[in-house]
Amino acid sequence: MAEKFIKHTGLVVPLDAANVDTDAIIPKQFLQKVTRTGFGAHLFNDWRFLDEKGQQPNPDFVLNFPQYQGASILLARENFGCGSSREHAPWALTDYGFKVVIAPSFADIFYGNSFNNQLLPVKLSDAKVDELFALVKANPGIHFDVDLEAQEVKAGEKTYRFTIDAFRRHCMMNGLDSIGLTLQHDDAIASYEEKQPAFMR
């Protein structure tokens, strides 16, 4: 079972860039591992650091600004997560500490992979995202309340509605990944296997 996502309140960091691809999110040289942990250290590596080894932080990159340390909600522009279909991208985001990404649109494969990894991708219109960028930049350190059950983002004095597919919403709220969904039918699977001839088991 994965961690359930129902509501989250977190610090928001504004990444004011469109078409952020998966190679920017987690560069290919860090993809050797097959476990989900450890990728956060290399999130946005080529932007966060001035050296290849990731030891010299880039002071001009927003994730390195002191006021955004500990951010768990990423505000971005359109077509977030485009490029190759590596699942390491949501792994890196969640390992870094992000729970939510808000953007006008997402690449389809990244969007699906996010749900599989309990990272909530929230789609809002360009105009609403513009409002949120203005709000965050005027109020560094602001927190948003994200309510998956109500499908709402509360930011400042305003509430923004979003829509998530009912099945994906159910899975996130109940902490069900692909394995968890399969285990829900464990008894039925065991019963089926018992009925099979011995040579097929």
UniProtKB/Swiss-Prot annotation:
Involved pathway(s): Amino-acid biosynthesis; L-leucine biosynthesis; L-leucine from 3-methyl-2-oxobutanoate: step 2/4
- State its Enzyme Commission number(s): 4.2.1.33
Q: Which reaction does it catalyse?
A: (2R,3S)-3-isopropylmalate = (2S)-2-isopropylmalate
What InterPro entries does its record include? 3-IsopropMal_deHydase_ssu, Aconitase/3IPM_dehydase_swvl, AconitaseA/IPMdHydase_ssu_swvl, IPMI_Swivel, LeuD
- One Gene Ontology cellular component: 3-isopropylmalate dehydratase complex
The top EC class, named as a word, is: lyase
Extract the GO molecular function terms from the UniProt entry: 3-isopropylmalate dehydratase activity
- Entries under Pfam families matching the protein: Aconitase_C (PF00694)
Extract the coiled-coil ranges from the record: none
- Keyword Amino-acid biosynthesis among record annotations: yes
Q: Which UniProt keywords apply?
A: Amino-acid biosynthesis, Branched-chain amino acid biosynthesis, Leucine biosynthesis, Lyase
Q: What are the BP-aspect GO terms?
A: L-leucine biosynthetic process
Family indicated by similarity: Belongs to the LeuD family. LeuD type 1 subfamily.
HAMAP family on file? LeuD_type1
User: What is this protein's function per UniProt?
Assistant: Catalyzes the isomerization between 2-isopropylmalate and 3-isopropylmalate, via the formation of 2-isopropylmaleate.
Summarize the subunit comment: Heterodimer of LeuC and LeuD.
Q: What is this protein called?
A: 3-isopropylmalate dehydratase small subunit
Q: Which organism is it from?
A: Escherichia coli O6:K15:H31 (strain 536 / UPEC)
